[in-house]
Amino acid sequence: MKEFPKHYNFTENEKKWQNIWQELQIYAYDPNISKAEIYIVDTPPPTVSGQLHIGHIYSYTQTDFIVRFQRMIGKNIFYPIGFDDNGLPTERLVEKQKQIKAYNMERDEFIKICLEVVKNEEAKFRSLFKQIALSVDWSLEYQTISPLSRKISQMSFLDLLHKGEVYRANQPILWDTVDGTALAQADIEDKQKISSMNYITFKTEQGDQLTIATTRPELLPACVAVFYHPDDVRYKHLADKSAITPLFNEKVPILADPLVQQDKGTGLVMCCTFGDQTDITWWKSHNLPLKTIITKKGTINFPHKLDIDGLTIKEARTKIIDILKEQSLLTKQEEIIQTVKCAERSGAPLEILTVTQWFIKTITHKEALLKRTNELNWYPKNMKMRLENWINSLSWDWCISRQRYFGVPFPIWYSKRIGEEGKILYADISQLPVDPLKDLPIGYSKEEVDPDLDVMDTWATSSVSPQLSTYGISEDLAINKVRHDKLFPMDLRPQAHEIIRTWAFYTILKSHLHQNILPWKNIMVSGWCLAEDRSKMSKSKGNVLVPEKLLERYGADVIRYWSANSKLGADTAYSEDVMKNGKRLVNKLWNAAKFVSIHFDKLTSEDKKVSLFDIKEKITNEFDQWMINKLVALVKLATNALQNYEYANAIYLTEKFFWSIFCDNYLEISKTRSYDEANKNPQGQYSSILTLYHIMQTLLKLFAPFMPHITEELYQILYNKNSIHMQGNWINYGDLNYEIDVQGPEGLLEILDIVRKFKAEYNLSIKAPIKLLEVSGIVLSTELVEDLKNVTSAEEIQFKAKDDQIKVNIKLFV
């Protein structure tokens, strides 16, 4: 055994062990091991869009608990790390950090700057993940913008294109006027905004007045119909008639449709192209004309004597309302709270424009995807409902085109050859990755093609995150078929709940379309980290916690302890109290280990090498045997909890045993016997030291997935030169069990508790001597009586007639 240092310095030790683990390749994946022995993780690649916060640490460490456990039970771990460093989120970071705008500079120059920024940001991410002791294999690192990732992503696109699951269409899509790009349904968020319901007077061709309520009067020039509900008796007389739009005097049909809400506004609604999803439905089902008046920049394109051309949407709305008022065509205005669909990133209200884009079919696969959702093992189970609700709510196919620059380009060109103008040309698999602005389709010259200028939605690449690591899209389409077949599908997808509708959904969709299979067997979903007052952390509130400062103050093990004390999937507030408890636990582990270690040299070197099962007969004391039985039960419970991704229960059970059973009771009960200064009971002494030796070792292994540094340091000092985190180093006691009557040891603890309360009540020292303990309700064995005398400082213990419950009469020395 090494010399025991006086104090534990987490700053020095954490850095020391991180370097040693890296040097010794403790967490390296072995590609030569069979698939049955591998545990494969689809690690979430953090988006390079800003600084990592405590919420990232919260989520990533919870995955690491499970991975470390799986490694210790003998699995060959495939645990990669990636960085999602392309797409709109990264572009926004670069524009903010460098004070530039992509559209104001050459594309190549902007991409070059993006690559420089992500390189610097990823170095920070990498450093933080190492500090927090994620046990990833860094040789498996990937970037979603790397040539290999671009190749896999483009391979995915072409595979779906050839299968008929990808199509290009000029149809209504969601448009972000701030970032100047199309978005998918998953990229939007609903925001509550104060708005006004405007009651506007229309007329029929016959001159009868109609009142229509709308929140978007600026779309009057794009009005193509007026609708009422077919059951609404107020408007049935309008069937087959036409209305005249105010200010613009356009004749539009009055039509009936069951989608109209009779109790909203006046029950009459104008259909414009486009204000919302319902407008699209009516436009398609009633074969209405298309009038586009909003530009991609969010301005009005409608030359008219009212002079609204070139105004912003907000300016046009104000101007049209003013004119309606002047002409007495606005009969009423009501302030309302309206749900507005906004871009998740820019926060801008979305418009619906008709633009040619690439889409992946999703609507036709909803039933199949719901079935896939039910085939997956969800941890916790209630998270499954979120994906089911999302799939049921889908009303758009997945638009994957983005009018941006720093992303994976479409491997597509459009022919300019005479006779095939506009023909879609796609790259050959052998050409990938391609940049259509620089590369050419086979058999065509630069003058004969136009490149597709868009890039893919970043989710189109991160949705194949498993395949970015397996180096293949399917059994038939792989860069490395052997690797792909061995690693796909994976065992675990860990992720946060807010990206179930994006990352989880898109990955399941892609895997289903590519290989007709789930991408993983299990999914563990983490919650959010909230501020101490349980509010959401935000820069504007100034309550965002910087991990680096917490690491400096508490160290990684304490932060990991805090993360482990939250149930999987739960939103948890940051807690200084829990952090302090974690610090207290680290100190107690150190002191307890230091205390028990002074006896270990009394054990034979042979007994230290073999398992407890092989020397179980040397643990002879009744209370020691009871402790080992409790320890074996703890190992079974903790192991079962971790196998079911219930890490919080595993650490709770382990910590409870450590504090209550081991430190508060066993260390005190066995202390005199362990020292045995008078050499009265050498067999009992050896039994207690052997028990201490194995309990401490087992506790270190149980705590190891959560607190890797302190457990490694203590394990090295007390037990073994090999790492505690080595593959196959978990505890296995099999069916070890001592046949004893538990009433004796448990009765001892009950008596001890009564004595302790008595001494506390009378302000007596815990070591204050007791003349006599008169006990009724139980009779203890000679061994237990000696242990009870030692721990209570009792000179004599007498057992009286049996009682229904244990009672203790305490007599002190006069």
UniProtKB/Swiss-Prot annotation:
<feature type="short sequence motif" description="'KMSKS' region">
    <location>
        <begin position="536"/>
        <end position="540"/>
    </location>
</feature>
<keyword id="KW-0547">Nucleotide-binding</keyword>
<dbReference type="GO" id="GO:0002161">
    <property type="term" value="F:aminoacyl-tRNA deacylase activity"/>
</dbReference>
<keyword id="KW-0436">Ligase</keyword>
<dbReference type="InterPro" id="IPR001412">
    <property type="entry name" value="aa-tRNA-synth_I_CS"/>
</dbReference>
<dbReference type="InterPro" id="IPR002300">
    <property type="entry name" value="aa-tRNA-synth_Ia"/>
</dbReference>
<keyword id="KW-0963">Cytoplasm</keyword>
<dbReference type="InterPro" id="IPR013155">
    <property type="entry name" value="M/V/L/I-tRNA-synth_anticd-bd"/>
</dbReference>
<dbReference type="InterPro" id="IPR009008">
    <property type="entry name" value="Val/Leu/Ile-tRNA-synth_edit"/>
</dbReference>
<dbReference type="InterPro" id="IPR009080">
    <property type="entry name" value="tRNAsynth_Ia_anticodon-bd"/>
</dbReference>
<comment type="subunit">
    <text>Monomer.</text>
</comment>
<dbReference type="GO" id="GO:0005524">
    <property type="term" value="F:ATP binding"/>
</dbReference>
<dbReference type="GO" id="GO:0004832">
    <property type="term" value="F:valine-tRNA ligase activity"/>
</dbReference>
<dbReference type="InterPro" id="IPR022874">
    <property type="entry name" value="Valine-tRNA_ligase_type_2"/>
</dbReference>
<keyword id="KW-0067">ATP-binding</keyword>
<dbReference type="InterPro" id="IPR002303">
    <property type="entry name" value="Valyl-tRNA_ligase"/>
</dbReference>
<keyword id="KW-0648">Protein biosynthesis</keyword>
<dbReference type="InterPro" id="IPR033705">
    <property type="entry name" value="Anticodon_Ia_Val"/>
</dbReference>
<feature type="short sequence motif" description="'HIGH' region">
    <location>
        <begin position="46"/>
        <end position="56"/>
    </location>
</feature>
<dbReference type="InterPro" id="IPR014729">
    <property type="entry name" value="Rossmann-like_a/b/a_fold"/>
</dbReference>
<comment type="similarity">
    <text>Belongs to the class-I aminoacyl-tRNA synthetase family. ValS type 2 subfamily.</text>
</comment>
<dbReference type="Pfam" id="PF08264">
    <property type="entry name" value="Anticodon_1"/>
</dbReference>
<comment type="function">
    <text>Catalyzes the attachment of valine to tRNA(Val). As ValRS can inadvertently accommodate and process structurally similar amino acids such as threonine, to avoid such errors, it has a 'posttransfer' editing activity that hydrolyzes mischarged Thr-tRNA(Val) in a tRNA-dependent manner.</text>
</comment>
<protein>
    <recommendedName>
        <fullName>Valine--tRNA ligase</fullName>
        <ecNumber>6.1.1.9</ecNumber>
    </recommendedName>
</protein>
<dbReference type="GO" id="GO:0005829">
    <property type="term" value="C:cytosol"/>
</dbReference>
<keyword id="KW-0030">Aminoacyl-tRNA synthetase</keyword>
<feature type="binding site">
    <location>
        <position position="539"/>
    </location>
    <ligand>
        <name>ATP</name>
    </ligand>
</feature>
<dbReference type="Pfam" id="PF00133">
    <property type="entry name" value="tRNA-synt_1"/>
</dbReference>
<dbReference type="GO" id="GO:0006438">
    <property type="term" value="P:valyl-tRNA aminoacylation"/>
</dbReference>
